[in-house]
């Protein structure tokens, strides 16, 4: 028989920098999960990824206090800001533009995000990422 799932915990954790301090400690502690075990496993799995890059992680908690977790790809907004070279998007994206992004950069981001997107093909994924970039006040070239 499969283990009984008691809940899910969704967090954004910097790659390679999971530690028991908030928000990880309290979120896992209230479910009775071993916080240090998660931190060590997460840091081991994210070794090859740029340190500090925020990664969404979904932790499945089971009734016997065990857990599994799935690491997703980084948020599109963070990848777009990194490609453009800005720290934050425009407060008024319709009038004030913060930078520009090329189709090649969009394709690179789409390759990274493809497993988490619902897009049918690469072109649809590029258009999805381009829409996110436009809503952040970034000029999109070649789409």
UniProtKB/Swiss-Prot annotation:
Transmembrane segments: none annotated. One of its GO terms (molecular function) is structural constituent of ribosome. Keywords: Methylation, Ribonucleoprotein, Ribosomal protein, RNA-binding, rRNA-binding. InterPro entries: Ribosomal_uL11, Ribosomal_uL11_bac-typ, Ribosomal_uL11_C, Ribosomal_uL11_C_sf, Ribosomal_uL11_CS, Ribosomal_uL11_N, Ribosomal_uL11_N_sf. One or more lysine residues are methylated. GO terms for biological process: translation. One of its GO terms (cellular component) is cytosolic large ribosomal subunit. The keyword rRNA-binding applies. It comes from the Bacteria. PROSITE patterns: RIBOSOMAL_L11. It holds the Pfam family Ribosomal_L11_N. Forms part of the ribosomal stalk which helps the ribosome interact with GTP-bound translation factors. Belongs to the universal ribosomal protein uL11 family. Part of the ribosomal stalk of the 50S ribosomal subunit. Interacts with L10 and the large rRNA to form the base of the stalk. L10 forms an elongated spine to which L12 dimers bind in a sequential fashion forming a multimeric L10(L12)X complex. This is Large ribosomal subunit protein uL11. It comes from Albidiferax ferrireducens (strain ATCC BAA-621 / DSM 15236 / T118). The lineage of its organism: Bacteria, Pseudomonadati, Pseudomonadota, Betaproteobacteria, Burkholderiales.
């Amino acid at each position: 028989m499969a283990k009984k799932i008691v809940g899910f915990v969704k967090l954004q954790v910097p790659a390679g920098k999971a530690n028991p301090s908030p928000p990880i400690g309290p979120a896992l502690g209230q479910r009775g999960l071993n916080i240090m075990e998660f931190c060590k496993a997460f840091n081991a799995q994210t070794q090859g990824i740029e340190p500090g890059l925020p990664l969404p992680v979904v932790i499945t908690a089971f009734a016997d206090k065990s857990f599994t977790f799935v690491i997703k790809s980084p948020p599109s907004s963070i990848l777009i800001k990194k490609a453009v070279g800005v720290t934050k998007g425009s407060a008024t994206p319709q009038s004030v533009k913060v930078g520009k992004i090329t189709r090649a950069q969009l394709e690179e981001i789409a390759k990274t995000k493809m497993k988490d997107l619902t897009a049918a093909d690469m072109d649809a994924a590029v258009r999805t990422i381009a829409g996110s970039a436009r809503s952040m006040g970034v000029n999109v070239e070649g789409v």
